């Protein structure tokens, strides 16, 4: 079993915390009344986006798909009564490059059902819907690859 160990330190009268990950990276968090950091619930949604994005891009690379840009947009609805858990999340994947739609569908599906632990957790309370858009680009050599004309 993998264990996670993190640390939070109060910074501003208990209204702001700096969290430190086990790898030593810091993130600033604020409560619902402040504006000096991300709210914890926002970080949960960002974690979902990051988790699925890393999965999808890694799977697409293994499939030899050429991705030149990738954005993930997330929207969520929450319960009105505490705990205000997510009840619905929409993830929109926007990729640029030479990517086959079926490869992207497969990568998203694998992330959702097999690899993304954040998706598995949030999916316990929320319906997660995904959409995608591919913005095609002319097939060009990857950085560092020589073209026939330059050989």
Where are these regions (language model features)?
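Extended beta-strand/beta-hairpin segments
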Residues: 1-46, 57-151
């Amino acid at each position: 079993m993998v264990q996670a160990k993190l640390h939070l330190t109060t910074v501003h009268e208990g209204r702001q915390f700096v969290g430190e990950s086990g790898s030593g990276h810091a993130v600033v968090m604020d409560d619902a009344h402040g504006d000096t950091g991300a709210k914890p619930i926002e970080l949960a949604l960002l974690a979902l986006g990051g988790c699925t994005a890393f999965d999808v891009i890694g799977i697409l690379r293994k499939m030899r798909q050429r991705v030149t840009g990738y954005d993930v947009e997330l929207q969520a609805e929450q319960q009105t009564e505490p705990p205000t858990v997510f009840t619905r999340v929409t993830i929109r994947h926007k990729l640029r490059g030479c990517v086959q739609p079926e490869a992207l569908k497969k990568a998203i599906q694998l992330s959702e059902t097999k690899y993304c632990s954040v998706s598995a957790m949030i999916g316990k309370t929320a319906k997660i819907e995904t959409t995608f858009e591919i913005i095609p680009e002319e097939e060009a050599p990857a950085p560092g690859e020589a073209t026939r004309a330059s050989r």
